[in-house]
Amino acid sequence: GAIRGRQLGAKDLLTPTSFHRENMHMEESKMQTKETFMAHPEITDQEVKNALNHAIEQVERQVPEFYDEFPAAASKDNFYPKIENVDWTNGFWTGEIWLAYEETKDEKLKEAALHQVSNFKNRIEKKIAVEHHDMGFLYSLSCVAAYKLTGSEEAKEAALLAADNLMSRFQEKGQFFQAWGKLGALDNYRLIIDCLMNMPLLFWASEVTGDEKYKEKALAHIRTCMKVVVREDGSTFHTYFFDPETGAPVRGVTAQGNRNGSIWARGQSWGVYGCAMAYKYCKDPVYVDYFREVADVFMKHLPSDLVPYWDFDFEEGSDEPRDASSAAIVACGMLEMAKYLDKEEAAYYTSCARRLLKALTDHCLYKDEKESNGILLHCTYARSTPTNTCNNNGVDECCTWGDYFYMEALVRLCAEWETYW
């Protein structure tokens, strides 16, 4: 099982806790309490149906446009430009098509998604832009989904090749999947919290092949990740470095958050959904504890309209941009975890998810095709600050994962849904 303690390397001058608390400035008075959060309205069943239909209409409208090509990771002025199948985000669009197909049973959607599966097979066979850890984001929502829904052998083969590709990034020293860059390089010897959502691809690979090696490495990575990225107060680091010589944990830093000690909203949301997925596959109760902690921190830091700022350094009244996508991810994680909890706690997290989805639907859902060719507005891909390492990209725009997770959460509320993850 996972170990709850934090094992810190000799190079840690500050523990994650002290680093975080010295820097934390959000006033308690501005935080959501359980009472203030639960005072918000839930999305009704009819509103769920209406919002999902509205989202599906947008997918149907965009399929001819994004058939051979894909929407970019983020929109520009709320309209996605076209890109080839070369980014870590391409799978989200194909996932949206599969969700729309499941709801409508429209053969045109199935055909379009399978057409893209062939594109994904070509990508992994030719090793086009796959030297990173995001094989799950790319292949769970495109090819595993296709295999589960249609039995496509081509999809199964592509997804297994992607799983093998991900396995090549496992670092024995440290027991984690290296996210980016040249394997073993000192400046890239780290994991990132997002990778929790790449692990389901490996659990699936073990299920369909009978080979436990995929599952074993996934479990090792999850154990390592949760030990180092979750701080004592339930907030999270975006990325964590290890010593390539010894494998010892070294330090938590941000790439896309405001600064190393802040709480990047989407990182926190990957933690929420990642814990739910970890529990789904390993049933270790420690992941329920982690889930409660990270979900609680996420909800506490929401402003009064429940649409999260891109980083939780920012609070009510700030003019910093929001990241609606992180709330959609959290809603999915809550609805997944609710399957495994007792009745009372399951009802609580389902109710929390409904409140988040009500806020997203009221404030962030596109109005019509003149406004956007995406679905969920007010997302932020990357916001550059003097204390992080990213460039501005998709600030207050649509992001493909925001569209996808918003749809997934609505689908989860409409019916029993077998996940693609």
Can you describe what each PLM-predicted range is?
Residues 2, 10, 15-17:
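Ala/Thr-enriched low-complexity intrinsically disordered regions
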Residues 4-6, 21:
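Basic polycationic patches enriched in arginine
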Residues 12, 20-25:
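Intrinsic-disorder-associated, low-complexity terminal segments enriched in Asp/Asn/His/Tyr and depleted
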Residues 16-19, 74:
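A generic alpha-helix propensity feature with a strong bias for hydrophobic helices
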Residues 26-421:
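Glycan-recognition and catalytic cores of secretory/periplasmic carbohydrate-active enzymes
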